[in-house]
Amino acid sequence: MSDLKAAALRALKLMDLTTLNDDDTDEKVIALCKNAKTAVGNTAAVCIYPRFIPAAKKQLREQGTPEVRIATVTNFPHGNDDIEIAVAETKAAVAYGADEVDVVFPYRALIAGNADVGFELVKQCKAACGDILLKVIIETGELKTEALIKQASELSIKAGADFIKTSTGKVPVNATPEAAEIMLTVIKDMDVAKTVGFKPAGGVRTAEDAQAFLAMADRILGGDWADNMHYRFGASSLLANLLHTLGEGEEAAQGGY
């Protein structure tokens, strides 16, 4: 198997196959769940709005892939600084049956100089999650600077994040190699690689993109670190490209998350 094919297979099994669109329906989410089951393996998770969790859970069970996890989003995509609302949404997501919650860090508050609200929001959302995985979206494309990306990553980890995630996919700049390098280095420098994972989201569209992101993780944190409890790709259009690279199916037109 070529290096690119090996990376494509690895990336497929690390995908949070995502649909977070305003026009999502039960039918679209069911189709997404069907796509999570492929001839070469299943994606790690599907990522959907909370109201679609029951439909996804039923479909994943019926198609014989109950191990595909269900991730959802809260405080999304705006990243407002109302802790009470973020916690209420997170509790509701847990009640719906989410296996994982991706919450948006109040990044605009941090840009304005308020670090405390972000720490407290993540801490309280993690308390609401209990054992359920909490991924914190820091919105690197809006934070922009290395100092702010580093600070948001550190605050999230100190507050209890299980993963730090680059982006919502709803702003002009999403996952970049530069942001990934900063965030992975924070995980290394804080010595939390055993307990904290990383998720680039938005903008990872090809097997070559995924290969480059994985090579960076291997370089910074070691070749066996990026398993499906420490590394995810948040993507939709990536799947068709990975399957095409692996000789499965036709490559769809590129677009989306």
From Swiss-Prot:
Catalytic activity: 2-deoxy-D-ribose 5-phosphate = D-glyceraldehyde 3-phosphate + acetaldehyde
GO molecular function, one term: deoxyribose-phosphate aldolase activity
Pfam families the record matches: DeoC
CDD domains: DeoC
GO biological process: 2-deoxyribose 1-phosphate catabolic process; carbohydrate catabolic process; deoxyribonucleotide catabolic process
Similarity annotation: Belongs to the DeoC/FbaB aldolase family. DeoC type 2 subfamily.
Protein name: Deoxyribose-phosphate aldolase
Species: Photobacterium profundum (strain SS9)
